[in-house]
Amino acid sequence: MRKNVRYIALTALVISAFVLSGCDMFRKTNDGKVDLKWYMGLTYEDDNGKDVNYTTKSGDSVVAVALEDKYSEQYGIMKDADVFVSIDMVKDNIDPRFYYDKSNGSLMFTNATTSYEMPLNENVIDKGKVNYTTCIKENKKCYINIETVKKFVDINYKLTKAEGDAPAILSITYKSGKKNIMTTDSNIEMRTKGDYQNLIVKEISKGTKVTVIESGKNWDKVRTENGYIGYIPVSELNDSGTQEVSFKNDDDTYTHVTLDTKVSLAWNQIYNQNANNNFDELTANVKGVNVISPTWFSLVDKNGNLSSLADLNYVEKAHKKGMQVWALVNDFTDRKLTKKVLTSTALRKKFINNIMYFADSYELDGVNIDFEYITEEIIDDYLQFLRELSIECRAAKKVLSVDNYAPSKWSAYYDRKQQIKLVDYLIIMNYDEHTSASDEAGSVSSMSYAQN
């Protein structure tokens, strides 16, 4: 009896040891393979809850797009030998400076000094010929040739052709930094999640190099050079070292016109031409202000024209007092005008030319853009306006400042991170905590409100 007890105890001990060591003897393994089109974002769920493959109206093949650490939710398009990717995918993940003008059907890319225009379905960039079609339209959306993206942004890409059940994959890399490279120790199955019970993505051959996306205790999320993303056991990976990856950017070309000291700015509300005559009286006892912004210009019609209350004598007086003049430009006339002008490249150009004409004619040091009718629908158009205006201000050495609402969830779409790259000064209008429309009386801008 004691001998039997010893055998039972020994057996239990051995089993425990196997379990604790993760022995394959007790591992439940799923031999099923995932639907790669579904896994890579090439399907959608119809009204009946059924997964349906995406197709194009033109009959061209769809392509999975593998980004640095995930698959894009927006498919690419294979057209002849070219691959086109969604402009939204490019803007959200690679570079936000691509812009599609629906009014004239052209793609634009704008950097610190130049705005390039590319008509749909043509091999033209700013009237110069290239050996590929720069962009196409599919399902009312603009798709950009990956070669067009590469022309303006430093990226690497690799196209893996469709084979069997596996779709074609466009693998794109574009992020600089240290990459942890591993090599597979044997032939191993990549899975959808870090567990043997999850479906197989692909059989990965021994000696395959992979980039680690997420490190885990037992499984690493990795990416192969040809765009397969999934999980591999840590025990099957050998460390191949760290690779420093560097993609070029043009951040240093975005020069700024700034003051050598802190800006102390005051706005001067000008309702009519005669109000300019009050400058001496209004500033008689003012100290510390080094910038004044008279509210002189308004967008007044659908052709991009401005109304003006500007006064050269006012500018001369301000300069004598050591003040720069950044005249304010607003869109308070009509929200429909704002949308009409900003959504057209031709009208934006006229509008910007008018702004720069007045800035030059009245010897302004800068302009202050104060637009209140920027909805989420036209934010891309507004940002494109700032890109184009910044080119002109940069060239003319005029300060470009822009007014923004206080940061909040509802105004997050204003994309201040992108704005600050374009403009010289981003001004937060940190008030309106309580207004005449509020349910209760209170501070216009309390300390806690301003700090938040």
Q: Residue ranges of each PLM-predicted region?
A:
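Sec-dependent N-terminal signal peptides of Gram-positive bacterial secreted proteins and lipoproteins
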Residues: K3-K28
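Catalytic domains of carbohydrate-active enzymes, especially glycoside hydrolases
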Residues: N277-V300, I355-V367
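Primary recognition of N-terminal secretory signal peptides and signal-anchoring hydrophobic helices
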Residues: G22-G216, S246-Y254, T258
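Substrate-binding cleft of extracellular glycoside hydrolase catalytic domains
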Residues: E316-V367, F371-I374
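Boundary/entry segment of secreted carbohydrate-active catalytic domains
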Residues: N187-E189, Y228, P233-D280
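Substrate-binding surface in catalytic domains of secreted glycosidases
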Residues: K302, L306, N353, E376-N452
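Hydrophobic faces of well-ordered beta-strands that scaffold small-molecule active sites
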Residues: S264-N268, N290-P294, V325-V329, V367-I369, ...
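SH3/SH3-like beta-barrel fold
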Residues: G207, D220-T224, I232
